[in-house]
Amino acid sequence: MSGTRASNDRSSHPGGHKRPRYDVGNKVTVVLGAQWGDEGKGKVVDLLATDSDIICRCQGGNNAGHTVVVEGKEYDFHLFPSGIINPKAISFIGNGVVIHLPGLFEEADKNEKKGLKDWEKRLIISDRAHIVCDFHQAVDGLQEVQRQAQEGKNIGTTKKGIGPTYSSKASRTGLRICDLLSDFDEFSARFKNLAHQHQSMFSNLEVDIDGQLKKLKMYAEKIRPMVRDGVYFMYEALHGSPKKILVEGANAALLDIDFGTYPFVTSSNCTVGGVCTGLGIPPQNIGDVYGVVKTYSTRVGIGAFPTEQINEIGNLLQTRGHEWGVTTGRKRRCGWLDLVILRYAHMINGFTALALTKLDILDVLDEIKVGVAYRLNGKRIPYFPANQEILQKVEVEYEAMPGWKCDTTGARKWEDLPTRAQNYIRFVENHIGVPVKWVGVGKSRESMIELF
């Protein structure tokens, strides 16, 4: 057939009108952890949240722990977006988040005592988010005991019911917020089935079905005014008036269910893909993606950790950095910064800039090492091994740099940092090929030095 069919003419429309150009709309700014969590994401989010209109959580549950210091007060957030502190912004819990309702209100109470006000007027919850039941939390603990007995090791779960809830979701037996708010008899029947299903797997699991349902009915009325159709809410946010929208990632790249150090991972996607699926937004609405990385590495629980320092260096980092988990209170394992991991996290997330936190913890060191490559059987490997046994065997190639041996906690701009600290930062930038936008030298908002 010769010629071009009119229907293929991209510029015309039936009737000869021009096709409307698709407007992408507002873009979201994303903050993600680039290691095993505890990088200081809350602090970066807090900086950006001060002039954001909407702050979103897209995955995870109250297994995350974000600490934010405002006017000398320390707030701890687990389920809430840490932007809930901003009285001018809306906080949104997306469909990818799993919600333990008692945990949500407990967290609200604790932070209200510290000065958080009117949070219920600024919180919106997606109707498609899944519910963490009390028995999911009990099962989480029982599974950990079972793993310990069978394999002699455990995953190091927070016992917040996150894994079992995502399991229910994937096996299509989960309960969502929209189910809780519609026909309660239908919800109760499904709740009972789900509880019995878990009891058939764990003979010693006790579930107070009536008691839990009574509690859930009470929470249903409390959250009803906050629940919206999340897809429409996000679409309106993206395509309405210009808005600054911030997405706060929980957990981190190396804890991602697909890309993390499996099986010692969490049960959701904590990389950039989780933003689209956890909020119901298209990829073209992703704007800047900021990776948050500590100037050294930490990990909670077991699993391979190539740059771990089980020596005085590790102890010094643990003590100086106050490395205890916000959610679990467990001591964190410590080691040198691993640029193989950071490069891998960048490959998946496409970071547009980095936030380098806790630089001040390195102030006292004579020499600072950075992992730059892995060797396996004496040969350099150009990838990050997926298999845990192989990752356990890699030897790390280090680059050593002289320490700056002076206090950086008073630095407020780039010029205030000692030359050797500047060199360390530039080394990280050049190795990864991503600029460092912030450098953290202390706990407060003011101690995040903005470089551009």
Curated annotation (Swiss-Prot):
Q: What is its main location?
A: cytoplasm
Instruction: State the pathway, as annotated in the record.
Output: Purine metabolism; AMP biosynthesis via de novo pathway; AMP from IMP: step 1/2
- GO terms for MF: adenylosuccinate synthase activity; GTP binding; magnesium ion binding
Record's SUPFAM superfamilies? Answer: P-loop containing nucleoside triphosphate hydrolases
Record localization? Cytoplasm
Q: Could you say which EC number(s) this protein's record lists?
A: 6.3.4.4
**Residues binding GTP, per UniProt:** 37-43, 65-67, 332, 358-360, 440-443
Q: Does the record carry Disulfide bond as a key word?
A: no
The record's top EC class is ligase
Q: Please tell me where Mg(2+) binds in this chain.
A: 38, 65
Q: Which domain of life is it from?
A: Eukaryota
**Amino-acid positions noted as binding IMP in the UniProt annotation, renumbered to this chain:** 38-41, 63-66, 158, 172, 251, 266, 330
**Catalyses which reaction?**
IMP + L-aspartate + GTP = N(6)-(1,2-dicarboxyethyl)-AMP + GDP + phosphate + 2 H(+)
Q: GO cellular-component terms in the record?
A: cytoplasm
Entry's HAMAP family?
Adenylosucc_synth, Adenylosucc_synth_vert_basic
What's its job?
Answer: Component of the purine nucleotide cycle (PNC), which interconverts IMP and AMP to regulate the nucleotide levels in various tissues, and which contributes to glycolysis and ammoniagenesis. Catalyzes the first committed step in the biosynthesis of AMP from IMP.
Q: Family assignment?
A: Belongs to the adenylosuccinate synthetase family.
What is the protein name for this chain? Adenylosuccinate synthetase isozyme 1
Source organism of the structure: Xenopus tropicalis (Western clawed frog)
Gene encoding it?
adss1
